[in-house]
Amino acid sequence: MTNKTLDLSVYFIAGAQNFSECSLDGATQKIALIIKSGVTVYQFRDKGTIYKEQKQRLSIAQKLQKVSEEAGVSFIVNDDVELARELNADGIHIGQTDESVSKVREKVGQEMWLGLSVTKADELKTAQSSGADYLGIGPIYPTNSKNDAAKPIGIKDLRLMLLENQLPIVGIGGITQDSLTELSAIGLDGLAVISLLTEAENPKKVAQMIRQKITKNG
């Protein structure tokens, strides 16, 4: 791990599957460009289903980790604890159906950031004492970026959930440019986005917009 602080404000999530029209090299290049556009965190969310050989996935993860390090961006691995350990990533992010936070913490140690996804109020309550370093709450709005996404929380219930929270929070799910102002006013530490950046004509402009909204109201 090289990044000792975690700025959650512009949290980018993607894998090669988010650029299905591209070759693996093309997808990797597009992700690298977005990493260098001003994001603060990059989460390598790549389930490995599109590779002929798993060593291709490791190679791409290593390339994107290097890009992240050079850009001063925290590199976090989604779900795959062994990959996070092999890469000595800055962090690991897990969901409610993965191994428990305590078990993952035993494997990765105290030096690696550990994020946990939360989809409803009772999960948020339990997460407070789980040992996670930060939480990803969502989906806030309906989203097409994740096939197995839970029911949208909505801005009203999200506000109520945040009143009971003591941990750094990243909002995720269906975030568009039109929703940035609404989201910036409720006390989130960052916004996690996929399509808002992968489909942007100017990722740098979008990343700057997110950061300005979050830091202005943070």
UniProtKB/Swiss-Prot annotation:
| Binding positions (4-amino-2-methyl-5-(diphosphooxymethyl)pyrimidine) | Q43, F44, R45, D46, K47, N78, S117, K146
CDD domains per record: TMP_TenI
Q: What class of enzyme is it?
A: transferase
Pathway given for this chain reads: Cofactor biosynthesis; thiamine diphosphate biosynthesis; thiamine phosphate from 4-amino-2-methyl-5-diphosphomethylpyrimidine and 4-methyl-5-(2-phosphoethyl)-thiazole: step 1/1
InterPro entries for the chain: Aldolase_TIM (IPR013785), ThiamineP_synth_sf (IPR036206), ThiamineP_synth_TenI (IPR022998), TMP_synthase (IPR034291)
EC code(s) of this entry = 2.5.1.3
Residues noted as binding 2-[(2R,5Z)-2-carboxy-4-methylthiazol-5(2H)-ylidene]ethyl phosphate in the record, renumbered to the chain: T143, N144, S145, G174, I194, S195
Task: Give the coiled coil ranges.
Answer: none
For the ligand (Mg(2+)), the binding residues are D79, D98
The UniProt catalytic activity note for this protein reads: 2-[(2R,5Z)-2-carboxy-4-methylthiazol-5(2H)-ylidene]ethyl phosphate + 4-amino-2-methyl-5-(diphosphooxymethyl)pyrimidine + 2 H(+) = thiamine phosphate + CO2 + diphosphate; 2-(2-carboxy-4-methylthiazol-5-yl)ethyl phosphate + 4-amino-2-methyl-5-(diphosphooxymethyl)pyrimidine + 2 H(+) = thiamine phosphate + CO2 + diphosphate; 4-methyl-5-(2-phosphooxyethyl)-thiazole + 4-amino-2-methyl-5-(diphosphooxymethyl)pyrimidine + H(+) = thiamine phosphate + diphosphate
Needs which cofactor? Answer: Mg(2+)
Q: To which protein family does this belong?
A: Belongs to the thiamine-phosphate synthase family.
- NCBIfam families per the UniProt record, alphabetical: thiE
Q: What is this protein called?
A: Thiamine-phosphate synthase
Q: What is the lineage of its organism?
A: Bacteria, Bacillati, Bacillota, Bacilli, Lactobacillales
